[in-house]
Curated annotation (Swiss-Prot):
It is found in: Cytoplasm; Endoplasmic reticulum; Golgi apparatus. It comes from Lodderomyces elongisporus (strain ATCC 11503 / CBS 2605 / JCM 1781 / NBRC 1676 / NRRL YB-4239). Homodimer. Component of the Golgi to ER traffic (GET) complex, which is composed of GET1, GET2 and GET3. Within the complex, GET1 and GET2 form a heterotetramer which is stabilized by phosphatidylinositol binding and which binds to the GET3 homodimer. Interacts with the chloride channel protein GEF1. Zn(2+) binds at C281, C284. This is ATPase GET3.
Amino acid sequence: MELDLEPTLKPLIEQDTLKWIFVGGKGGVGKTTTSSSIAVQLALQHPESEFLLISTDPAHNLSDAFCQKFGKEARKVEGLSNLSCMEIDPEAAMSDLQQQAQQYNNDPNDPLKSIMSDMTGSIPGIDEALSFMEVLKHIKNQKVNENDSKDKISYRTIIFDTAPTGHTLRFLQLPSTLQKLLGKFQQLSGKLGPMMSMLGGGAGGQQDMFEKLNEVQKNVAEVNEQFTDPELTTFVCVCISEFLSLYETERMIQELMSYKMDVNSIVVNQLLFADDDENPCLRCVSRWKMQKKYLDQMAELYEDYHLVKMPLLGTEIRGVENLKKFSKFLMVPYDPKKDRGLITEMKEQ
């Protein structure tokens, strides 16, 4: 039975229960533009609620997309009072973790400290794990009024602008990575604890550190439960209409399904819609022919997905006003004949 799903993200934008939205795909397909557009539409459609857009990609682009500098602290978007952005720095998170370890044990000769440093640098996915720990820390500590520790912002939905596919999939494997890390630490604590004490290691400091790791694991396990609940979490795939991008999208969807994560929306960017051009160039016609071929394949392969088709514009999509104009096609399908003027009316930033 063929499903006739709406080719927009309107159901996602209007869903009341979503707490987490991940946006990911191959590098260079427009993930940041898409995640920014989703965040803008959420803020516009629900002005009474607060939203947070987080970049976990080391090559941050949110500042460029909004023409506004963001950092590791959540900052309000100028022109949208209920949307905040932040850019997570894994290197800074690693440095913070090492500093915290030194606070628990300031003995430079403690062998456990050296072992821990080697382990945290060698376990696959540790960068992504640290990024997520940083996310949890900032969400927990974010306040409406910095002078009132009890008055915290309650974000209706948090949107993740993720790194290219491989990093994103490791990011979503975070709970197992942390469990592996914590298990090794606990094993070392049990086997080497007495020896560390004999060598001068601070048993009390080590115990405090392991208790903190247990707390982190508990918090992450709770978030992981939410990640596998389709009422709370969904993943939006972003691609372009080319073979390699389609192949990568299918691979990513299969992996996401293995994590039991909900994914039912695909945004296809940079479409030319050359059939409706009054004076199309030969190169545009040729590329549009190729794009249509892969669009047809996607329509057949993902008939039970919301397949959103977004146009290639004549300029970069930067700034809140341009994002507002572009993002409306997440809610209402782009019409090449009626909406053609949008391609040239965007203001360069």
